[in-house]
Swiss-Prot record:
GO terms for cellular component: actin cortical patch; nuclear matrix. Its main location: cytoplasm. One of its GO terms (biological process) is cell division. The lineage of its organism: Eukaryota, Fungi, Dikarya, Ascomycota, Saccharomycotina. SUPFAM superfamilies: Actin depolymerizing proteins. It comes from the Eukaryota. Keywords: Actin-binding, Cell cycle, Cell division, Cytoplasm, Cytoskeleton, Nucleus. It is found in: Cytoplasm; Cytoplasm, Cytoskeleton; Nucleus matrix. Coiled coil: none annotated. This is Cofilin. Belongs to the actin-binding proteins ADF family. Pfam families: Cofilin_ADF (PF00241). GO terms for molecular function: actin filament binding.
Length: 143
């Protein structure tokens, strides 16, 4: 339960584990239910196109998301995959929505074990592929 009293739905944890352990999904979009009492799965996808993921982030609404971010490691070391948690809170979203998403984030974030990086996005430049790649690949050779 978060400071805002919002709980994380069991389906949210199940979907996350399906992504993390079963590689069933490439990304998950989470939202607050209509009553603003629970964080639920809004959509899952196995589409590996990062632009398809970005298209699911609305211009005027807050969301949470998990993306299984895959990238090439330099020096011919192959691919690496990291699970990234997104808090999408666009500048154009209603203030009340931004406040409840901000105060509810910790409940979801704490429930999702195995996330490598956190990305806060208020506009699309902050969640662009290159921006996220820069964040997740820091120290890529040191793990």
């Amino acid at each position: 339960m978060s400071r805002s009293g919002v709980a994380v739905a069991d389906e949210s944890l199940t979907a996350f584990n399906d992504l993390k352990l079963g590689k069933k999904y490439k990304f998950i979009i989470f939202a607050l239910n209509d009553q603003k009492t629970e964080i639920v799965v809004e959509e899952t996808s196995n589409n590996s196109d990062y632009d398809a993921f970005l298209e699911k982030l609305p211009e005027n609404e807050c969301k949470y998301a998990i993306y299984d971010f895959e990238y090439e490691i330099g020096g011919g070391e192959g691919k690496r995959s990291k699970i990234v948690f997104f808090t999408w809170s666009p500048d154009t979203a209603p203030i009340k929505s931004k406040m409840i998403y901000a105060s509810s984030k910790d409940a979801l974030r704490r429930a999702l074990n195995g996330v490598s990086s956190d990305v806060q996005g208020t506009d699309f430049s902050e969640v662009a592929y290159e921006s996220v790649l820069d964040r997740v690949s820091k120290g890529a050779g040191s793990h």
